[in-house]
Design a protein with these regions (language model features):
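Active-site proximal loop and beta-alpha junction motif in alpha/beta enzyme cores
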Residues: 1-141
Length: 142
């Protein structure tokens, strides 16, 4: 997806359509001073069934899945958007050690196919800050 956003500089459009493994997606680019500042995409309906995510959990939807990394406990909500995601709330994303915890949590036994780990900070009712540890890739700007 990131490569498509970079192409904007050549085509000067605010909407870009791309084909992904999860289907065709439309990206809406927020442009400021001729640079892509943010990208918005409708990823469709999330998959919430544990066996389809996949995640090992008796609870559906999977909320408050408690996992531990380096003696720190996390509570995750898990979804699939074509691949497994586990989201947890942290106090401050800027100071949070994403690499330290992401690489451990990605391969937790609760995730048979590994998982993308999102560390989210709630700013207000409409905004969050998030950092992403992508399975097999490390921290990304996704």
């Amino acid at each position: 997806m990131c490569r498509k956003v970079c192409i904007w500089q050549r085509i000067y459009k605010t909407t870009v359509t791309i084909e992904t493994l999860a289907g065709i997606k439309t990206l809406k680019l927020n442009i400021k001073d001729k640079k892509v500042e943010t990208v918005r995409v409708d990823m469709g309906e999330p998959i919430l069934e544990a066996d389809k995510i996949p995640v090992i959990s008796k609870e559906e939807p999977v909320k408050n899945l408690e996992l531990e990394a380096e003696n720190r406990k996390f509570k995750f909500t898990c979804v699939s958007m074509g691949n497994p995601h586990a989201i947890t709330i942290v106090e401050n994303t800027k100071e949070f050690e994403v690499e330290r915890y992401g690489k451990i949590l990605e391969v937790d036994k609760a995730f048979p196919k590994k998982a993308n780990i999102e560390f989210a900070q709630v700013i207000d009712k409409e905004n969050i800050k998030m950092r992403v540890w992508e399975r097999g890739a490390g921290e990304t700007l996704a």
